[in-house]
């Protein structure tokens, strides 16, 4: 399963390339863990504003909504200027932009791509609200609070 650092590396690998890109088409392969939530054609014409990460979710902010991507157990994202037109047997989401194509490869299909109206969308809130603080955000995560939290607890970190 991709852990948080791998998800962050994935985000960094394509975030600057896709920011500002316009969505030309969206193609779905076999169903993933959750449905997209809207017609793929509704994303055509949208512009990618930025790519963020919250926990293990990649959040692709569009000028009209947001895509939430979870890589599941075996998923990976690839952004390239030239990919085969047809989806392979383990490729389940393809977003072609004017700068390249973002493709989800997930052999076990535990991943998900969900289209929402943004951070305040009920689906987004349900998935993101319980995630806790961001360990890679120095503004919110401080050594002192971590140490104090450990000192107050008698629960083993990993039994």
Label every PLM stretch briefly.
Residues 1-63, 96, 144, 148:
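Extended, highly charged segments
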Residues 67-159:
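Phosphate/anion-contacting hairpin/loop surfaces
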